[in-house]
């Protein structure tokens, strides 16, 4: 069928006084619904009226006439050029548009391009632009131009001087139509002419007929593309619009290109769109689930840079290979754990080694402070803490978080790995993000709900360079670390099974600890202490978010590594002298160590842990006074505590500081039955407490410690209990008691969910933990009374005395 054909239907008076007309087809687009009205020109009562001209499209048609069997002339399109089309139509000048019955009957009989049932069920274009083809849009042609008024006279249109297009196909098609009309006239009697003309022939448009407004350029061989379109339309499967509307431009870009690349090229593996990431995204432009060959922890921005010819670009396969290595090893050896802190450029060796290769061994025993003092592995800036799996600076932490949460898709304009440093880290975000992933930052550590507090319990995944480790470790320590790595490499798998804890089989790290829980003793990390910490650490994915946020600020409770280094420095200086000298010289060296350590001297503690001051109460007050400053800093960083007013914060601290101190001492003493561990390694037994009048208080603390040991309280339950004790809303001095109670209920719900999830065999554990709070409060009441009596005539301990005076 040709692209555009139109036949002039001219009514003439018949032999019976009626009117007879010739109806020839007008091409209608298959996607256009024929919801229009059509009037038959052969009605008996019709009268010939004035002729009207309706300007429909921007095409001029010149008409030829072909003879018909009864002697009438049928006008036929001879050629057309770009201009205006004038189609004379019959009808009355005051034609009414409400002839509904006759028009509906005409539509029922003629069946003019009605949509089939399959077409009604098929998809429809979202906008008018979806109806157009790429050629029409790109060519910039004006496709529809309608005149607002109907003229009453025939106005000849002047066509612009443009070449005539596609003359022969249109004339050939119209000659075929004329021949078909002759066959129909011969086959059917005159009485049934109207009926068969309505059912067999396609009529020309009258005044109420719909006119096709869509122009499609003519193609050779009678436009096979139109036939294919008609075939697909009849089948009920309409193709998607080739040019979607502008409001869906973002959707079209992401549905025809990978999320990790520019919409102009295709670099990535096939993917499956999904809404698992964020259902609130209006455009769904970044909701993708990749095929199984990609790890869920990989960046959505991979394979951006084309590798040079003849070379293997490591930024693509190195990350995937590393993930496969980690996934294949279920129980890492201690040698592998000793290499788990990697920060140097030697990690790029993963790009050129096989799957079975391992990292070069690096010495173990690195403290948190040594890691913080090292440069950022991504840009070389100063490290601010443990962020998303590695120690990094604040700038790279924020960049990684914004990139993942905002789903940024960066592309390197240089096409290769760019240098990332402090001065150039903002020039190429694509290479910077790839380096973040290579150094060990984890996508799953970013919170999708954008709440504060990341999942910082992920273990480090990079190794420290030997150049940085050599000045930090002594030769003996370096030799010991090398020996430990050699022994670990020869260790059999069945000998390493005891390194798995009882909470889901998580490997216990032997070289590093969680950043949120540094060593309580403050010395170098030991394997025994780290084993205990590993038993208490659980999988982060099953920990409630509130408990994880509380755990993230737990390190503020402890002394900093700088303070611990000041304490341990004199101990190492006088250790050799005290071992070779007599007891008197050892005593003098211990006294000298006490004098040279401000913290030990203020706390009244000696290097060997014995009480250097006979007044134990004064020592404990000094320790408590120093610890209270840490408690205040810890409270101000808690997620729930920050939402409370300043006056209520002070009131809560005054009422709970003693409970917090004693509860931390009891939890610290779980592994030492019969004695209470104080701060900085100080231990008090029941016999020592009797001689100082603290028997009742220490006895109650030992009883509470036994209950904690029996319940197997871990670190998450410990930090949750501290927050619950802090947010006690039963005091009358609170201004917003309801708000404090709501915060405490949130902590209670998180603790209950945690205990039920991790200890399903002991459902009563949550209730038993809460029963320990009244015992703790009674013990603290006794301790406060003793401190008030003992320190009435003693020295002033600043914050401790201020808190004691605030309660009385």
UniProtKB/Swiss-Prot annotation:
BP terms from Gene Ontology: regulation of DNA-templated transcription; spermathecum morphogenesis
Low complexity bias locations: 280-289
Bias type Polar residues, positions: 1-14, 254-265, 327-351, 516-525
Zinc finger (NR C4-type): 376-396, 412-436
GO molecular function list: nuclear receptor activity; RNA polymerase II cis-regulatory region sequence-specific DNA binding; zinc ion binding
Highest taxon listed in the record's lineage: Eukaryota
Residue positions where Phosphoserine is found in the record: 90, 98, 100, 106, 127, 276
Record's signal peptide: none
Keyword Transcription regulation in annotation: yes
GO cellular component, as recorded: nucleus
CDD domains reported for this sequence: NR_DBD_Lrh-1_like, NR_LBD_F2
Family as reported in the entry's similarity comment: Belongs to the nuclear hormone receptor family. NR5 subfamily.
Identification of the protein by name: Nuclear hormone receptor FTZ-F1 beta
Gene name of this polypeptide: Hr39
């Amino acid at each position: 069928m040709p692209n555009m054909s139109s036949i002039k239907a001219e009514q003439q008076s018949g032999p019976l006084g009626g009117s007879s007309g010739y109806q020839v087809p007008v091409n209608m687009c298959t996607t256009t619904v024929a919801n229009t009205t059509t009037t038959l020109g052969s009605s008996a009562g019709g009268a010939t009226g004035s002729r009207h001209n309706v300007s429909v499209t921007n095409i001029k048609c010149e008409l030829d006439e072909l003879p018909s069997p009864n002697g009438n002339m049928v006008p036929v399109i001879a050629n057309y050029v770009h201009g205006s089309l004038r189609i004379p139509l019959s009808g009355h000048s005051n034609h009414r548009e409400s002839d509904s019955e006759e028009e509906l009957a005409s539509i029922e009989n003629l069946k003019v391009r009605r949509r089939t049932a399959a077409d009604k069920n098929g998809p429809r274009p979202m906008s008018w632009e979806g109806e157009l083809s790429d050629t029409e849009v790109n060519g910039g042609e004006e496709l529809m131009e309608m005149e607002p008024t109907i003229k009453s006279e025939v106005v000849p249109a002047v066509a612009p001087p443009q070449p005539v297009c596609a003359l022969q196909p249109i004339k050939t098609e119209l000659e075929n139509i004329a021949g078909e009309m002759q066959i129909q006239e011969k086959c059917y009697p005159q009485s049934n002419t109207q009926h068969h003309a309505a059912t067999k022939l396609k009529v020309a448009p009258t005044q109420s007929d719909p006119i096709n407004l869509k122009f499609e350029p003519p193609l050779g061989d009678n436009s096979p593309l139109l036939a294919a379109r008609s075939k697909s339309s009849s089948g009920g499967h309409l193709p998607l619009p080739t040019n979607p509307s502008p409001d869906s431009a973002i959707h079209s870009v992401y549905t025809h290109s990978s999320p990790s690349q520019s919409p102009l090229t295709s670099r990535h593996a096939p993917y499956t769109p999904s809404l698992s990431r964020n259902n609130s995204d209006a455009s769904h432009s970044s909701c993708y689930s990749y095929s199984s060959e990609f790890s869920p922890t990989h960046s959505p921005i991979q394979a951006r840079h084309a590798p040079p010819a003849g070379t293997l670009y490591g930024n693509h396969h190195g990350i995937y290979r590393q993930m496969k290595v980690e996934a294949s090893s279920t129980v890492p050896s201690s040698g592998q754990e000793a290499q788990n802190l990697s920060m140097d450029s030697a990690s790029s060796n993963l790009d050129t080694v096989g799957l079975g290769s391992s990292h070069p061994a690096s010495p173990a025993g690195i403290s948190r402070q040594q890691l913080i003092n090292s440069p950022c592995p991504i840009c070389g800036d100063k490290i601010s803490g443990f962020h998303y799996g590695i120690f990094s600076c604040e700038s790279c932490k924020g960049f990684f978080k914004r990139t993942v949460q905002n789903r940024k898709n960066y592309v390197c304009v240089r096409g290769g790995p760019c240098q990332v440093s402090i001065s150039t880290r903002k020039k190429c975000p694509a290479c910077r993000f790839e380096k973040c992933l290579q150094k060990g930052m984890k996508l799953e550590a970013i919170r999708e709900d954008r709440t504060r507090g990341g999942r910082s319990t992920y273990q480090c995944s990079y190794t420290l360079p030997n150049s940085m480790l050599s000045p930090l470790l002594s030769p003996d320590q370096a030799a010991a670390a090398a020996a430990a790595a050699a022994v670990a490499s020869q260790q059999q798998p069945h000998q390493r099974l005891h390194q798995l804890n009882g909470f889901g089989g998580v490997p216990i790290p032997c070289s590093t600890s969680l950043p949120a829980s540094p060593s309580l003793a403050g010395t170098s990390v030991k394997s025994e202490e780290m084993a205990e910490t590993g038993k208490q650490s659980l999988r982060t994915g099953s920990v409630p978010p509130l408990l994880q946020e509380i755990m993230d600020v737990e390190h503020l409770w402890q002394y900093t590594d700088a303070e611990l280094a000041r304490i341990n420095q004199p101990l190492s200086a006088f250790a050799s002298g005290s071992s070779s000298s007599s007891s008197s010289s050892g005593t003098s060296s211990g006294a000298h160590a006490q004098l040279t350590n401000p913290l030990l001297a203020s706390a009244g503690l000696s290097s060997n842990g014995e009480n250097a001051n006979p007044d134990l109460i004064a020592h404990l007050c000094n320790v408590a006074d120093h610890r209270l400053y840490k408690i205040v800093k810890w409270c101000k960083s808690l997620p729930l505590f920050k939402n409370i007013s300043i006056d209520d914060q002070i009131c809560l601290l005054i009422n709970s500081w003693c409970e917090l101190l004693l509860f931390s001492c009891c939890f610290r003493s779980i592994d030492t039955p019969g004695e209470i561990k104080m701060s900085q390694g100080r231990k008090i037994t029941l016999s020592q407490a009797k001689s100082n009048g603290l028997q009742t208080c220490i006895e109650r603390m030992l009883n509470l410690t036994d209950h904690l040991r029996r319940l197997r309280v871990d670190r998450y339950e410990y930090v949750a209990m501290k927050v619950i004790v802090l947010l006690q809303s039963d005091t009358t001095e609170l201004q917003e008691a309801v708000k404090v109670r709501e915060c405490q209920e949130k902590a209670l719900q998180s603790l209950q969910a945690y205990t039920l999830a991790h200890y399903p065999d002991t459902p009563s554990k949550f209730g038993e933990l809460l029963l320990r709070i009244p015992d703790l409060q009674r013990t603290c009441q006794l301790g406060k009374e003793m401190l008030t009596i003992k320190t009435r005539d003693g020295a002033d301990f600043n914050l401790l005395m201020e808190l004691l005076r605030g309660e009385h």
